[in-house]
């Protein structure tokens, strides 16, 4: 590659680097900066202080909220993987027609074209006291009265699963369609069963998609505040804690909690990416 071509490549990436810097790095840097400021009725006073972090790490509520959020998010990721992997596998290997694959993908994507609040609130007529599930259970004689299905950890996980499972399906599907079928054929030729070929060839090669999907779902659920506020029934999550502090104009405290959240994201991503190379997905 000539010097001119190298210079041309560098010039071409300048606009994208500026976008990342302005809309990504600078806001994060501002959040970190505000997290060291003093809170006031006007939002914050630009006076350096570590008191926000002292209060954050010295509070038992922080550990409780972080544990609850990570536990519920991990359960959601596991369920999304159990549900999403078979769907992605079926779409990649069982649906042969590209037209049918496109149709199925559109059917999965169309609900996400609706407003998030509408999709979330649609769970009320499903899980509510007079919702479809309770009416069905009562008419079937399973229960004598309506069950309290909303405002619980189970309902929160179910709504998260419905909302973010597509984020698990898509990267797994992209990883599966990139797998060379000759590897599976070679395993079968050497005497491996379909299940053994899947475990030894398909699953390891699809791990980048699993990792990317898991990170997507984990980040989305940990940072979500609207769903816990509407359906959590008093369950405190990290995203909800940040939103409540920000709405109360406790911006430095909210920023400190946000920095903690970012550090958790980075730590989890680092641990996972040490063992899986997601560049194979692209």
Q: Can you name each region flagged by the protein language model?
A:
Residues 44-58, 233-245:
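Short hydrophobic, aromatic-rich alpha-helical segments embedded in or entering the lipid bilayer
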Residues 275-282:
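Short cytosolic juxtamembrane segments of multi-pass membrane proteins
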Residues 247-249:
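Membrane-helix boundary and inter-helical linker elements of multi-pass secondary transporters
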Residues 190-192, 204:
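Glycine/proline-centered hinge or cleavage motifs at structural transition points of membrane proteins
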Residues 186-187, 197, 242:
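Hydrophobic positions on the alpha-helical face of helix-turn-helix-like DNA-binding modules
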Residues 5-41, 56, 60-177, 201-223, ...:
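Membrane-water interface segments at the C-terminal ends of transmembrane alpha-helices
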Residues 173-185, 193-194:
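Membrane-helix/interface signature in polytopic inner-membrane proteins
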């Amino acid at each position: 590659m000539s010097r001119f071509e190298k210079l041309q490549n560098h010039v071409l990436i300048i606009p994208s680097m500026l976008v990342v810097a302005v809309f990504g790095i600078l806001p994060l840097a501002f959040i970190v900066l505000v997290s060291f400021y003093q809170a006031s009725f006007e939002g914050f006073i630009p006076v350096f202080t570590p008191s926000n972090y002292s209060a954050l790490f010295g509070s038992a509520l922080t550990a409780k909220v972080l544990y609850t959020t990570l536990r519920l998010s991990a359960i959601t990721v596991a369920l999304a993987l159990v549900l999403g992997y078979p769907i992605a596998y079926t779409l990649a290997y069982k649906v042969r027609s590209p037209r049918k694959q496109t149709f199925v993908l559109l059917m999965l994507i169309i609900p996400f074209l609706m407003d998030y609040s509408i999709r979330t609130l649609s769970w009320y007529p499903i899980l509510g006291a007079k919702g479809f599930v309770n009416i069905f259970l009562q008419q079937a004689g399973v229960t004598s009265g309506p069950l309290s299905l909303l405002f619980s950890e189970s309902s929160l996980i179910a709504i998260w699963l419905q909302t973010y499972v597509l984020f698990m399906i898509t990267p797994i599907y992209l990883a599966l369609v990139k797998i060379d079928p000759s590897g599976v054929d070679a395993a079968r030729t050497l005497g491996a069963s379909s299940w053994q070929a899947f475990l030894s060839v398909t699953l390891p090669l699809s791990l980048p998609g699993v990792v990317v999907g898991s990170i997507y779902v984990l980040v989305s659920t940990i940072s979500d505040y609207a769903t816990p506020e509407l359906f959590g029934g008093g369950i405190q999550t990290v995203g909800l804690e940040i939103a409540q502090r920000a709405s109360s104009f406790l911006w430095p405290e909210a920023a400190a909690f946000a920095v903690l959240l970012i550090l958790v994201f980075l730590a989890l991503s680092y641990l996972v990416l040490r063992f899986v190379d997601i560049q194979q997905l692209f």
